[in-house]
Amino acid sequence: MIRFGIILLILSSFTISQQDGKNIPSPSWKDTSPSMLIGDFKDDYGIAYTLTDSLFTQHPNVKYHIIKWNLKDNYFIAKNDGANPSEQNLYSRIDFMEFSGMEPFRWGFCLTVYDAPTDSIAETKAVADRKDPKKGCGGFPFSRMKRK
């Protein structure tokens, strides 16, 4: 019983020190989300998006709750919102890449996996081909993004 109390005290101290007593998302999200991707965007089809360190929204009503950023391999894993029109509460892998010479489009994304039952399956099920952004998203182009 004493061990349980000590473990609880250590964990509660860690939680308080990690969040400074504020009700905010994990600092690691903000520290690992690339600033180039954060903000309001339109793709080359005119669809509007908003991306924060913890939420990717395809307006008006499709949301992906980001649970993991992988900057080394340029993707993030997200849980599909329960109110999405399809694939509710499943998991997605969204690959991204930076563009050069395609201004005003600075980056693009590929919804590589959108219907995995777990986050680990979404992460390992498929990978986008960034060598050919015009066909590297399962035979389709990456959606090119520009700031609104």
Task: Name the predicted role of every residue range.
Residues 48, 56, 63, 83, ...:
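Generic "edge-of-domain/loop-turn" microfeature
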Residues 2-38, 100-148:
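Amphipathic/hydrophobic helical signal segments and adjacent flexible N-terminal regions
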Residues 63-69, 80, 91-100, 110-113:
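Hydrophobic/aromatic beta-strand elements that line small-molecule binding cavities or substrate pockets
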Residues 76-84:
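Short beta-strand segments that buttress and anchor functional surface loops
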